[in-house]
């Protein structure tokens, strides 16, 4: 064996180690990163021993790896906190502010859209635009003295007296535009006013005129006896069906009178209802009775609306 010629091929023996490049000649992937990592680990060993932490946790703390805190924080979509900017931008993190904002906006919308406690539907709330208007107020007053109607008719302006036709002086004034019926007993009736204040003012003016004629007239027991209001419901009404359904309260004779007469029990009001939708309310002592009667009759009229 020792005298054999050397082979042209360098075949190593069994115990001959393979030729390995030197350590500084080896080509390793990510050599620079690993070298830096080893240096940082060697520098971190004393601090790790002092902290008593594991190398991974200590290395992460030294390298500044972002750690999630245990407390929860609900970010808004309007701005990003420094902690959010340091966290890795994963799709979940990027979507979380939008989801939180969406939940917040949906809660606000639900709170706004939640209905308020509903009240029972009343005729006034069903159509608040319709309000009866006062057309005439009849009031009475006691002048508390005997009157000479011929003297009043001769000396007063805008006064007429025909005892064969009517046993009272009819006197008119322009403001408020009203008419007075003056009786010899000292009683007076004032009609034509559109409001309670105008009716009282007109009655005082008539009493003052009679005082100027030489009578000791006073102003006692002024009282409103009747109020008349009217309104339009703006739709035609089936009066035949109304009188059949509410026969105990109403009467309808189109050959005698074109309107249906409806006598309401409470309030004690008489209504004249026409097929055109016009309604006249009379018999009230205060205007609230007019409004209450219309509130009661409006849903009935709406149920008999012509199609």
From Swiss-Prot:
Q: Which UniProt keywords apply?
A: DNA-binding, Nucleus, Repeat, Transcription
Give residue ranges of the sequence repeats: 134-210, 224-301
Q: Where is this region: Disordered?
A: 1-21
One CC-aspect GO term:
nucleus
Q: Which PROSITE patterns does its entry note?
A: TFIID (PS00351)
- State which residue ranges cross the membrane: none
Q: Molecular function (GO) terms listed?
A: DNA binding; RNA polymerase III general transcription initiation factor activity
Location relative to the cell:
Nucleus
Question: Which HAMAP family does the entry link to?
Answer: TATA_bind_prot_arch
Q: What is stated as this protein's family in its record?
A: Belongs to the TBP family.
Quaternary data: Belongs to the TFIID complex together with the TBP-associated factors (TAFs). Binds DNA as monomer.
Relate the protein's function as given in its record: General transcription factor that functions at the core of the DNA-binding multiprotein factor TFIID. Binding of TFIID to the TATA box is the initial transcriptional step of the pre-initiation complex (PIC), playing a role in the activation of eukaryotic genes transcribed by RNA polymerase II.
**Name listed for the protein in its UniProt record:** TATA-box-binding protein
The record lists the organism as Bombyx mori (Silk moth)
């Amino acid at each position: 064996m020792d005298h054999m010629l050397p082979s042209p091929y360098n075949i190593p023996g069994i115990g001959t180690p393979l030729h390995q490049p030197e350590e500084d000649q080896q080509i390793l992937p990510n050599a620079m990163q690993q070298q830096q990592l080893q240096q940082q680990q060697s520098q971190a060993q004393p601090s790790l021993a002092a902290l008593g932490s594991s190398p991974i946790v200590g290395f992460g703390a030294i390298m500044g790896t972002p750690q999630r805190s245990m407390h929860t924080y609900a970010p808004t979509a309007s701005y990003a906190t420094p902690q959010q900017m340091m966290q890795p931008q994963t799709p979940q993190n990027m979507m979380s502010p939008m989801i939180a904002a969406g939940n917040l906006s949906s809660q606000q919308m639900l709170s706004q859209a939640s209905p308020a406690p509903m009240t029972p539907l009343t005729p006034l709330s069903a159509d608040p635009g319709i309000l009866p208007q006062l057309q005439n107020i009849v009031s009475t007053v006691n002048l508390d003295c005997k009157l000479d109607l011929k003297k009043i008719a001769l000396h007063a302006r805008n006064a007429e007296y025909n005892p064969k036709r009517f046993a009272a002086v009819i006197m008119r004034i322009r403001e408020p535009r009203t008419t007075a019926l003056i009786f010899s007993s000292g009683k007076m009736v004032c009609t034509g006013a559109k409001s309670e204040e105008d009716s009282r003012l007109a009655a005082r003016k008539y009493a003052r005129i009679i005082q100027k004629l030489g009578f000791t007239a006073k102003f006692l027991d002024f009282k409103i006896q009747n109020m008349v209001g009217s309104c339009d419901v703006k739709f035609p009404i089936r009066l035949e069906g109304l009188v059949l359904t509410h026969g105990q309260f109403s009467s309808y004779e189109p050959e005698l009178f074109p309107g249906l007469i409806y006598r309401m029990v409470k309030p004690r009001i008489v209504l004249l209802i026409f097929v055109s939708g016009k309604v006249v309310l009379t018999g009230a002592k205060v205007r609230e009775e007019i409004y209450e009667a219309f509130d009661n009759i409006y849903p009935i009229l709406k149920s008999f609306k012509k199609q």
